Amino acid sequence: MISGVFVSYRSAALAARAIATFREEARLAGREAEAIAVVNSGDAAEREALVPHADRVLLPPRNLGFAGGLNAGIAAARGGTFVLANPDLLFCRGSVAALAGAAEAGGLLAAGPALYADGARSVLLPPAEEARPEELARRALAADPARTARVFRREARRAAAQAERAAAGESAFVRGLSGAVVAVTRAALEAVGPFDEGYSLYYEENDWQRRLLVLGGRLVYAGGAHVVHLFAQSTRREPRSAAWFAESEARYYETHFGEAGKRGLARLASCAPFEAPPLPVAGGLSWVDPAPAAVAISPFRHFRPFALALVPHGESRWTPPADLVAAHAGETLFVRAFARASGATLAEARFAG
């Protein structure tokens, strides 16, 4: 049996859709499945809204955080394989089969999918980075206007490689997976241990994945598993999110990297706010260079991290998908068209949702 564990926080409608697509994909794969929903809001109405959709709905007496919610759901589940998930997901055709197959391939493994920001799967979310002090250094470089272009070119190469894997349905061993959805067997969970509930929100997946890697386990990017992630639909409305992120980040780096982690955090904190010329507001991008192009989409002016849209050959125009715009209503997104071969900027703008 495959157990889907969905941790919901003021996201009942999203979680219901996620559960429905998970169930359908498990059915098409010929796999027995169950869905466990953990309602972290403490809202009995949210629990009742999910009762028709999940096999079990847990309503803890307090907010357990994402880590605690996963642990509670895992403890209540019966499956030998788990899909541990955010509520703001849509499982695409073949995704549950591909994730389960990758997680069950033998050995100490965890698997994650190709994540898209839109239903048409034209905008690929960024590759996960292994959270190490070197990653803090890259974030500091990205915040430096004199060095940000070099960091962007590296990210563009990684994103393009991931897009090609996803398009071809290819899998690869990686050093980090998004925590939005991870597939893992019960045996692997028992070997690595539960998620650390000291993380209120954020970095719980990095901590768990690092423990798996230290034990000799491997992380699999399952390019044949495509999942739409509407991204931060509950946390972006939570005023404590920024504080939780800072607390979890400090805890993770200091726990796993000691003084090197502290130095990396201090360097990042000392960076001046990123400054660059303002971009014009536009509803799309156009450019004249005929070279193969891609578009980066980011909430940050320095474009780190960014989602990637590959522009079809021969086209020199791009408009954001309507569902991406709707998911980020009220936010500003920065967009950059760039030459895929060189990373050179072709056009830039900002979208004010």
Where are these regions (language model features)?
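Short, flexible, basic/aromatic active-site loop/helix in glycosyltransferases
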Residues: 130-174
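Acidic donor-binding segment of Leloir-type glycosyltransferases
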Residues: 22-62
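Short aromatic/hydrophobic "clamp" motif used to bind/position activated sugar donors
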Residues: 82
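A short, conserved alpha-helix in the catalytic core of glycosyltransferases
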Residues: 165-169, 175-193, 197-225
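Glycine-rich, basic loop-to-helix element that forms the pyrophosphate-binding segment
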Residues: 60-77
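Conserved donor NDP-sugar-binding/catalytic core segment of glycosyltransferases
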Residues: 90-127
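Short, well-formed alpha-helical segments that are part of the catalytic scaffolds
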Residues: 11-26
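Active-site-adjacent helix/loop segment of glycosyltransferases
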Residues: 209-282
